[in-house]
Amino acid sequence: MENQKEKILVVDDEASIRRILETRLTIIGYEVITASNGEEALLVFRKEYPSLVVLDVMMPKLDGYGVCQELRKESDVPIIMLTALGEVCDRITGLEIGADDYVVKPFSPKELEARIRSVLRRADKITTSLGVPNSGIISIGFLKIDTNKRQVYKNNERVRLTGMEFSLLELLVSKAGEPFSRASILQEVWGYTPERHVDTRVVDVHISRLRAKLEDDPSNPDLILTARGTGYLFQRIIEMNKL
C-alpha cells in the first residue's frame, strides 16, 4: 500500500479515541504510534520521527498548544489539531502557533483520514507542478525558492517553512500578480472542496505566518499582498534560473 511507510503519531488523553484512530489508520496502511499526554508525545516524537502528528488540544499539564510550540522549535512535521466543537479560538490559536490543519470533535474517522492524506500529500518533498518549473530556483529579490528541495532562502539564509506554508507560497508564486480567492486557496492547498464549510481564517493565519517569515516588514508587506475583497496575491516579478 502507498501509505505503508508513513508513520503517524496520535496524541490524545482519551484512550477510546487513540484506540479507534490506531485501528482505522492501521487498516488503511499507516504505521501508528500513540501518546496519552503532551510530555509523552514529545518523547515519542523524538524517538520515532513520525511523518505526521494528530494532536488533541485539550490535555492535562502540557496541552496541545504547548506540544505544537515545542515541535515547531525542532521540526516542520505536519500537525493536525483536534479541537472542540464551536471553539473557534482553539482552531485559530493552533494555526497561529504552527499547526497545518484542524479537525473538529466529534469527527468522522473518514474525515480525519481524508485530512491526513491531503496534508501528507502537500507536505511531500516531491514538488508537484503548479506552473512553476521544478528544475530551477525562483529568484525574487532577496528571496530564493528551490522548488526541487522545497526550500526557501531569505538573504541567502534558510527559512524553515512547513509543508503547507511552502505549498501556499508555491501557489501564489505560480501566478505572481494574479489574486487568489480564499476559497481557491483552500481548494488548491488544503484540498477543501467548495461545498465544505471551512473557516477561511485558515488561509489568513497561514498568510500571516508566511509574511512573518518572509517579509522585511510583515505589517506592511511588499511580497504577499491582500487583494481587497478577493484574497491574496504575490506581487514581485520573478526570474527563473536553472539549477
UniProtKB/Swiss-Prot annotation:
PANTHER family: OMPR SUBFAMILY, REGULATOR OF RPOS
NCBIfam families cross-referenced by the UniProt entry: ResRegRpaBCyano
Cited InterPro entries: CheY-like_superfamily, OmpR/PhoB-type_DNA-bd, Sig_transdc_resp-reg_C-effctor, Sig_transdc_resp-reg_receiver, WalR-like, WH-like_DNA-bd_sf
UniProt record, GO biological process: regulation of DNA-templated transcription
Gene this chain is encoded by: ycf27
A family per Pfam: Trans_reg_C
DNA-binding region(s) in UniProt: 76-94, 135-236
Taxonomic lineage: Eukaryota, Rhodophyta, Bangiophyceae, Bangiales, Bangiaceae
Entry protein name: Probable transcriptional regulator ycf27
Tagged with keyword Transcription: yes
Occurrences of domain Response regulatory (ranges): 7-120
GO cellular component: chloroplast; cytosol; protein-DNA complex
Principal localisation: plastid
Subcellular location: Plastid, Chloroplast
Function: Probable promoter-specific protein mediating the interaction between DNA and RNA polymerase.
